[in-house]
């Protein structure tokens, strides 16, 4: 079984159990804290992915690192991953958990790149328009790229909506090149 499929299955099971138990918010907070630590500690991630380190030791290390920072339910999940020799999937499970939670909550993550900083009203109008377009609540990550000259580029999953001056110039160049 590929690691992506396994990560998604563990994340789905964790989210299902958290929803049934009514502690989704606690789990989200716990996993956000774990995500930060794992992102900052390459050594921790390397240890979790190492086949040389046995599951019991991985579980003890996770307990030491996160004791008091996460709930007992989260610690039990860590122990399960270690027992099943899947501790190396922890970072991927956290990402899949977030994606599934957003999916179930009708939230879509959108990357918006513009040539100039959008003011609050422009951002609000763009987000509202994207919400209508997707039919979901939009969580936008805004970034700047002065090389775009003007306009915006929006990425929603695998879909890219490119209304930048650079893109329009490239299309014009391509169209003129075909006619010549």
Curated annotation (Swiss-Prot):
SUPFAM superfamilies cross-referenced by the UniProt entry: N-terminal domain of the delta subunit of the F1F0-ATP synthase
Main subcellular location: membrane
Any Pfam family hit: OSCP
Keyword Ion transport: yes
Topology of the protein relative to the lipid bilayer: Peripheral membrane protein
InterPro entries on file: ATP_synth_OSCP/delta_N_sf (IPR026015), ATPase_OSCP/dsu (IPR000711)
A molecular-function term among this protein's GO annotations: proton-transporting ATP synthase activity, rotational mechanism
UniProt entry tagged with the keyword Chaperone: no
Gene3D superfamilies: N-terminal domain of the delta subunit of the F1F0-ATP synthase
Annotated keywords: ATP synthesis, Cell inner membrane, Cell membrane, CF(1), Hydrogen ion transport, Ion transport, Membrane, Transport
Location in or out of the cell: Cell inner membrane
Segments forming a coiled coil: none
GO cellular component entries: plasma membrane; proton-transporting ATP synthase complex
Subunit annotation: F-type ATPases have 2 components, F(1) - the catalytic core - and F(0) - the membrane proton channel. F(1) has five subunits: alpha(3), beta(3), gamma(1), delta(1), epsilon(1). F(0) has three main subunits: a(1), b(2) and c(10-14). The alpha and beta chains form an alternating ring which encloses part of the gamma chain. F(1) is attached to F(0) by a central stalk formed by the gamma and epsilon chains, while a peripheral stalk is formed by the delta and b chains.
Recorded family membership: Belongs to the ATPase delta chain family.
Record's function text: F(1)F(0) ATP synthase produces ATP from ADP in the presence of a proton or sodium gradient. F-type ATPases consist of two structural domains, F(1) containing the extramembraneous catalytic core and F(0) containing the membrane proton channel, linked together by a central stalk and a peripheral stalk. During catalysis, ATP synthesis in the catalytic domain of F(1) is coupled via a rotary mechanism of the central stalk subunits to proton translocation. This protein is part of the stalk that links CF(0) to CF(1). It either transmits conformational changes from CF(0) to CF(1) or is implicated in proton conduction.
Entry protein name: ATP synthase subunit delta
Natural source organism: Chlorobium phaeobacteroides (strain BS1)
